[in-house]
């Protein structure tokens, strides 16, 4: 039997259906007495007296508009600058507060956005 290259094998697998691949994996496991399941790492108990690690610092933040305040037009302008939304979309976002303005942004970007919105008269929350 001719030896197949890795590329040849992959080409053959691409032509198989999921059922055929599943049957192949089962046959392979039985033939070579192995399992296709990923090994699970088990952590041992923590050493006594070991300090508990601090929670990982959050690196993604959401800027949530909680209220438009008295200067709604200014807030809409700032929302448009921050999000590149159209006038109607920005107005709907401001009218529907509380709503997220920016999601999963860096801390400094979230702080700058919050400052801009607060400067326009909005009430803002950074989570």
UniProtKB/Swiss-Prot annotation:
- PANTHER family per the record? 39S RIBOSOMAL PROTEIN L12, LARGE RIBOSOMAL SUBUNIT PROTEIN BL12M
Which UniProt key words apply to this protein? Ribonucleoprotein, Ribosomal protein
The entry describes its oligomerization and partners as:
Homodimer. Part of the ribosomal stalk of the 50S ribosomal subunit. Forms a multimeric L10(L12)X complex, where L10 forms an elongated spine to which 2 to 4 L12 dimers bind in a sequential fashion. Binds GTP-bound translation factors.
Task: Family membership, please give it.
Answer: Belongs to the bacterial ribosomal protein bL12 family.
Name of this protein: Large ribosomal subunit protein bL12
> What is the purpose of this protein?
Forms part of the ribosomal stalk which helps the ribosome interact with GTP-bound translation factors. Is thus essential for accurate translation.
**SUPFAM superfamilies in the cross-refs:** ClpS-like, Ribosomal protein L7/12, oligomerisation (N-terminal) domain
**InterPro entries per the record?**
Ribosomal_bL12 (IPR000206), Ribosomal_bL12_C (IPR013823), Ribosomal_bL12_C/ClpS-like (IPR014719), Ribosomal_bL12_oligo (IPR008932), Ribosomal_bL12_oligo_N_sf (IPR036235)
Record keyword Ribosomal protein present: yes
GO BP terms: namely: translation
* Any Pfam family matching the protein: Ribosomal_L12
State one molecular function term (GO).
structural constituent of ribosome
Query: Can you quote a single GO CC term?
Result: cytosolic large ribosomal subunit
């Amino acid at each position: 039997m001719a030896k197949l290259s890795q590329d040849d094998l992959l080409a053959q697998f691409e032509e198989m259906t999921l059922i055929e691949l599943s049957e192949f994996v089962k046959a392979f496991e039985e033939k070579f007495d192995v399992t296709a399941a990923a090994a699970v790492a088990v952590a041992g108990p923590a050493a006594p007296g070991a300090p508990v690690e601090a929670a990982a610092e959050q690196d993604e933040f959401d800027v949530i508009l909680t209220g438009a305040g008295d200067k709604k037009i200014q807030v809409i302008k700032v929302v448009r600058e921050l999000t590149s939304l159209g006038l109607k979309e920005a107005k709907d976002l401001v009218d529907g507060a509380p709503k997220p303005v920016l999601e999963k942004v860096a801390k400094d970007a979230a702080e700058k956005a919050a400052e801009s919105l607060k400067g326009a008269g909005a009430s803002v929350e950074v989570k």
